[in-house]
Regions:
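An alpha-helical, amphipathic repeat domain used for nucleic-acid recognition
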Residues: 1-94
């Protein structure tokens, strides 16, 4: 039996969900968009929230990329693999 689809989150609830995700680790804008889209009441709310997070510097693709690369270097991943993974997360190769 299928579970009923939950009601969309208000803007405030959506912000709390985003902050909860960002409190665990940095996320790219695209990652947040993919994770929050099913919960958002509208695409406009989600876009406004992502802009707000970037303006407040709570979310930064640059900071995400630096953290991501550092973690992958320690795992021994090569530059081509890291570039591919970054592109899949919505961050251009540096």
């Amino acid at each position: 039996m299928k579970k009923p689809k939950p009601d969309p989150l208000t803007y405030s609830e959506l912000r709390c969900a985003a902050v909860d995700l960002l409190s665990r680790r940095d996320h790219s804008r695209l990652e947040l968009q993919r994770k929050l889209r099913p919960k958002a009441a509208s695409a406009e709310d989600l876009d406004n929230l992502l802009n707000e997070l970037a303006e407040r510097r709570w979310q930064s693709d640059e900071r995400f990329a630096e953290s991501f690369v550092n973690s992958r270097v320690h795992r021994g991943h090569g530059p081509l693999r890291m570039q591919h993974e970054l592109r899949s997360k919505g961050v251009g190769a540096a």
